[in-house]
Structure formats: C-alpha cells, structure tokens
C-alpha cells in the first residue's frame, strides 16, 4: 500500500524537530450539496528545523516516530527537504 502524501501549511514550529501542519480539505454536505472546508492538524517530523510558520509543506506517512508523530516533512515551498533532498540528489 502506498504512503499517503498530504499538503498543508505550518501553523506551529515551536517544538524541536517537529512542526504542526494544518491540512484543509473540501467535503460536500450530503443534504445541501454545498462544499465545506474541513481541517485537521498533524504533527510532522522536521529533522533540520528548517520549516517556519506559514510555509507550504508536503508531508508523507511514515512509521511512528513518537506517540503523536507518524508523518515526515518531504518538501518545503516546493523544494525537497532532508532525506528526500539527499535521495533526489543521488
């Protein structure tokens, strides 16, 4: 099964090696057929502490890193980050 990949905005970078990413999605209301915005926050691993508040990031599912972290930041503002950048360069 492929790893899930989500795109969202960094809303907190206060933790060491961790960022909080807000992912928004649009869902149609079953009765009124109007699109509603739903959002969820994910704790994602940021090894180099390179992400800042407001950055647009891509996160990828990974094995659990801690109790709440099971996502890894793979790209920041369209540029690969960390292990993803090394794999792409090699």
Swiss-Prot record:
Q: Which GO terms describe its molecular function?
A: rRNA binding; structural constituent of ribosome
Give the CC-aspect GO terms: cytosolic small ribosomal subunit
Q: Extract the SUPFAM superfamilies matched here.
A: Nucleic acid-binding proteins
> What's a single GO BP term from this record?
translation
What the entry lists under InterPro entries is as follows: NA-bd_OB-fold, Ribosomal_uS17, Ribosomal_uS17_bact/chlr
Write the record's keywords in alphabetical order, separated by commas.
Ribonucleoprotein, Ribosomal protein, RNA-binding, rRNA-binding
Which Gene3D superfamilies does UniProt cross-reference here?
Answer: Nucleic acid-binding proteins
Functionally, this protein is described as follows:
One of the primary rRNA binding proteins, it binds specifically to the 5'-end of 16S ribosomal RNA.
Q: Which family does it belong to?
A: Belongs to the universal ribosomal protein uS17 family.
Mind telling me which NCBIfam families this protein's record contains?
PRK05610.1, uS17_bact
Assembly and binders? Part of the 30S ribosomal subunit.
> Would you tell me the protein name for this molecule?
Small ribosomal subunit protein uS17
- UniProt source species: Acidiphilium cryptum (strain JF-5)
Query: Taxonomy-wise, where does this protein's organism fall, top ranks first?
Result: Bacteria, Pseudomonadati, Pseudomonadota, Alphaproteobacteria, Acetobacterales
The gene designation is rpsQ
